[in-house]
């Protein structure tokens, strides 16, 4: 069944930011005579808001910083790295295919506005596809403490699409007719909590540290693929 709308995560799903997160984190760890960064810990951080991910990292590393201090240090370390990000394989073809099928799309990322702008500034050819349907992890419409794995961010993303449809006299799209694309377990949980179907595209480097629960593994509404390259959205 062809989805009526597709909703996307960003980091590690649309663009290759995860390698930069790993690199910048190892730079910080080295500064404090610690490291290397654990992929198991990274897997736990993925999909979380900046503050939640920072708390997980600081608890693991033992570095004596507040979440706010660590986030500021990460931003400083990453400043020159984000401009090197590029779309992951299959992404541009998929977005073009969705456009040709007139399937509306939205972006729901846990990245805050500052990081989103840094990551996307040189990738307008990718993010222009979203027609402004973008919500970040610090969006005021997202209640505090209700980031992924809670479903709220997907409901807000879908509302952006439906508000435009309503203005054009079109019927609203229901959550069960949406397809969410995610690379993290946290994101998969979030999409399913919203009542949406999910395509899980895990990073093969972190896959050994990811595992679906028995219920998730048996969930026919979760489809696992290792790449969006050659992905056929009409056959999910």
UniProtKB/Swiss-Prot annotation:
Belongs to the HAD-like hydrolase superfamily. One of its GO terms (cellular component) is nucleus. It is an enzyme of class 3 (hydrolase). Keywords: Cytoplasm, Hydrolase, Nucleus. PANTHER family: 2-DEOXYGLUCOSE-6-PHOSPHATE PHOSPHATASE 2, PSEUDOURIDINE-5'-PHOSPHATASE. Coiled coil: none annotated. InterPro entries: Gpp1/Gpp2-like, HAD-like_sf, HAD-SF_hydro_IA, HAD_2, HAD_sf, PGP-like_dom2. It is found in: Cytoplasm; Nucleus. GO terms for molecular function: phosphatase activity; pseudouridine 5'-phosphatase activity. This is Putative uncharacterized hydrolase C1020.07. NCBIfam families: HAD-SF-IA-v3. Its EC number is 3.-.-.-. The lineage of its organism: Eukaryota, Fungi, Dikarya, Ascomycota, Taphrinomycotina. GO terms for biological process: pyrimidine nucleoside salvage; rRNA catabolic process. Its main location: cytoplasm. It comes from Schizosaccharomyces pombe (strain 972 / ATCC 24843) (Fission yeast).
């Amino acid at each position: 069944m062809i989805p009526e709308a597709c909703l996307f995560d960003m980091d590690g799903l649309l663009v290759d930011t995860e390698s930069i997160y790993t690199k910048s984190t190892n730079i910080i760890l080295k500064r404090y005579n610690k490291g290397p960064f654990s992929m198991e810990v990274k897997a736990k951080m993925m999909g979380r808001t900046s503050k939640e991910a920072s708390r997980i990292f600081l608890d693991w590393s033992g570095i004596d910083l507040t979440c706010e201090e660590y986030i500021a240090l990460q931003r400083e370390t990453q400043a020159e790295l984000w401009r090197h990000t590029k779309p992951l394989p299959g992404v541009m073809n998929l977005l073009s295919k969705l456009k040709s099928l007139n399937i509306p799309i939205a972006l729901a990322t846990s990245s805050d506005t500052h990081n989103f702008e840094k990551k996307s500034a040189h990738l307008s050819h990718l993010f222009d596809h979203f027609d402004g349907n973008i919500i970040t992890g610090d969006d005021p419409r997202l209640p505090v403490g209700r980031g992924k794995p809670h479903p709220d961010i997907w409901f807000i993303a879908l509302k952006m699409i439906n508000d435009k449809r309503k203005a054009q006299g079109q019927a609203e799209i229901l959550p069960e007719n949406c397809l969410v694309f995610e690379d993290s377990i946290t994101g998969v949980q979030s999409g399913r909590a919203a009542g949406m179907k999910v395509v899980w595209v895990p990073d093969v480097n972190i896959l050994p540290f990811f595992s679906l629960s028995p219920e998730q593994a048996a969930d026919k509404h979760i489809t696992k693929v290792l790449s969006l390259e050659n992905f056929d959205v009409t056959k999910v």
